[in-house]
């Protein structure tokens, strides 16, 4: 499969656009959004659905290599924007969950969760030529994570349990990764103190969550041990940090946890991730994102810029990460930018029509900003269509097309699942112009962002199926981005944050509904000038149970609409 087949650009367009946030020209193929647009594999059993999760990503010999659970292979990229899929048959444990990789010298090492630990290596991972290492590490690893320190010492971390702690041990890569000493318990469960560790859709269940998916990052001489909680099936799945002065601790809880967290927006979840540096020195976090409708493990991958500094600590930019943002080709200060290109969502709950629909899968599900719901036509025949009315002509920059694979009967192994379609725009609903023509498409891209070379002013947008399909033509998101021509909402009034008197992990928020607002961004942090966490809310009230019991918090709220915020 050629690398060019995975570039996230419209094949009929090329060139650059100007970012509204930076004022700089950005190549189209570097404008992306979440979930990552990968050829997510359908699983071999149960209800037909795609899955990828528990990602790990490292830069090795000029390429980024991305591995994820249940993917039948892995991906590589030169720029974090376009991805080439590499099917893999030479790693017999590839189908086990939670892979980890480690570059040492000219070799990339791999292992995963399995009954008996087995490590593999490959000096040329662009080829499926992995070889087994004579593995001497005897611990049974669940959610393993390699880490190589600057002094050449190598460590293994692991843990995936609602009872057992996150563990760690030094290993010897020159002797089959044999453990050097006894493993140490590093992170225990504390759901009684840290609300975000409590399971449930809103952290409401009276039991311990799962602490899992560790990852180690070193910054300015200190060791940041990351872990995920409380469960992969929840939008409130996130990653937190403990910090210490040595690779095996002792570690202290970071008060501003979780550092990677995305409970709201089109797609939620930002847990069981891996933090890495790109070739320019920028930090990124790749993590699991959640659908969990057809199966608890129905998941996708997300990529988030991460700010790392001695002043502000570590935090991932997530709240606007399912809007268009750009992949930089230079060093960037992520304390000053989240890489957004400045386009607003124009399509939220606008009038929608369709050629047909199934009960429970009405057209409005395609623009309700919930990937968990979708529109499904009655058939997969050519000519099924969905149309959105922006209600007034607006400048459109991009369209995010998310296919839902409704009533598909696809199971691994399978050839690429290819959609063919075209997207039209109209100012009056009568005369239509072709914006994107994918009638000859040969790529498996279920979450593609289409970006125009120059914005077009249209009121109506329509996507039409052009290929006979065995299931139903279906969309979990037909999302239109650009610039409205009206006014942004006014400052939010009547904001109140009330802490529960009996359970201080819980806050309840209310505010006055603002005229013309699409939604609101609620921000918080443990320092007044450091509100690094955020959630998108489409109502004027919100309950959150993911706070620390003993921490004090500061909050702010802003309204947004199609004209800005």
Predicted regions mapped to residue ranges:
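Beta-rich carbohydrate-recognition and catalytic domains
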Residues: 23-206, 218-265, 280, 288-333
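Beta-strand-rich modules
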Residues: 546-564
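C-terminal motif of bacterial Sec signal peptides marking the signal peptidase cleavage site
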Residues: 18-19
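Disordered, acidic Ser/Thr/Pro-rich linker "stalks" and the adjacent N-terminal cap
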Residues: 327-393, 402-416, 437, 479-494, ...
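Trp- and acidic/polar-enriched beta-sheet ligand-binding modules for extracellular glycan
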Residues: 381-382, 409-485, 545
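Short beta-strand segments within Ig-like beta-sandwich modules, predominantly Fibronectin type-III
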Residues: 439-442, 533-539
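Pro/Thr/Ser/Gly-rich low-complexity, intrinsically disordered linker/stalk tracts
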Residues: 481-515, 549, 564-565
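Extracellular low-complexity, O-glycosylation-prone stalks/linkers
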Residues: 516-534
């Amino acid at each position: 499969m050629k690398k060019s087949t995975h570039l996230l650009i419209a094949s009929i367009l090329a060139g650059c656009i100007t970012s509204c946030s930076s004022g700089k020209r950005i190549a189209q193929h570097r404008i992306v959004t979440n979930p990552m647009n990968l050829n997510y594999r359908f699983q071999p059993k149960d209800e037909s659905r795609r899955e990828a999760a528990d990602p790990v990503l490292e830069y090795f010999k000029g390429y980024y290599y991305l591995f994820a659970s249940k993917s039948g292979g892995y991906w590589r990229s030169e720029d974090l924007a376009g991805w080439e899929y590499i099917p893999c048959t030479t790693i017999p444990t590839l189908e086990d969950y939670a892979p980890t990789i480690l570059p040492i010298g000219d070799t990339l090492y791999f292992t995963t969760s399995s009954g008996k630990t087995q490590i593999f290596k490959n000096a040329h991972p662009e080829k499926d030529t992995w070889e087994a290492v004579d593995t001497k590490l005897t611990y049974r690893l669940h959610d393993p994570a390699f880490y190589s320190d600057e002094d050449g010492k190598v460590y293994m971390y692991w843990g995936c349990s609602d009872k057992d702690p996150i563990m760690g041990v030094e290993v010897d890569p020159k002797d089959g990764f044999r453990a050097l000493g006894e493993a140490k318990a590093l992170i225990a469960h504390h759901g009684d103190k840290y609300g975000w560790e409590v399971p449930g859709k809103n952290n409401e269940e009276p039991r311990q969550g799962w602490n899992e998916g560790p990852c180690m990052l070193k910054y300015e001489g200190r060791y940041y041990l990351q872990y995920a909680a409380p469960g992969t099936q929840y939008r409130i799945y996130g990653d937190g940090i403990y910090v210490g002065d040595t690779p095996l601790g002792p570690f202290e809880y970071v008060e501003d946890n979780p550092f990677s967290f995305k409970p709201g927006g089109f797609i939620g979840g930002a847990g069981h991730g891996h933090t890495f540096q790109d070739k320019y020195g920028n930090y990124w976090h790749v993590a699991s994102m959640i659908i969990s409708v057809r199966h608890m493990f129905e998941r996708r991958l997300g990529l988030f810029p991460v700010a790392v500094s001695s002043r502000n600590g570590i935090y991932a930019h997530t709240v606007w990460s399912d809007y268009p943002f750009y992949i930089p080709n230079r060093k960037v200060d992520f304390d000053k930018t989240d890489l957004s290109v400045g386009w607003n969502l124009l399509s939220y709950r606008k009038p929608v029509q369709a050629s047909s629909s199934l009960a429970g899968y009405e057209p409005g599900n395609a623009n309700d900003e919930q990937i968990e719901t979708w529109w499904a036509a009655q058939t997969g025949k050519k000519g099924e269509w969905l149309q959105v009315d922006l209600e007034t002509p607006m400048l459109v920059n991009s369209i995010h097309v998310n296919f839902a694979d409704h009533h598909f009967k696809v199971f691994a192994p399978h050839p690429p699942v290819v959609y063919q379609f075209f997207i039209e725009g109209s100012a009056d609903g009568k005369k239509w112009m072709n914006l994107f023509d994918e009638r000859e498409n040969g790529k498996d891209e279920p979450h593609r962002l289409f970006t125009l070379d120059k914005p077009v002013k249209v009121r109506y947008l329509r996507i039409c199926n052009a290929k006979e399909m065995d299931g139903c033509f279906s969309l979990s998101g037909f999302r239109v981005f650009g610039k409205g021509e009206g006014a942004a909402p006014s400052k939010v009034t009547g904001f109140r944050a009330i802490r529960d008197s009996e359970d201080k992990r819980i806050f309840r928020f209310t505010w006055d509904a603002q005229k013309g607002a699409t939604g609101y961004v609620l921000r918080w942090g443990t320092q007044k000038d450091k509100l690094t966490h955020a959630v998108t809310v489409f109502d004027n009230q919100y309950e959150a149970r993911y706070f620390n019991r003993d921490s004090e918090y500061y909050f702010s709220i802003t309204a947004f609409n199609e004209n800005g915020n």
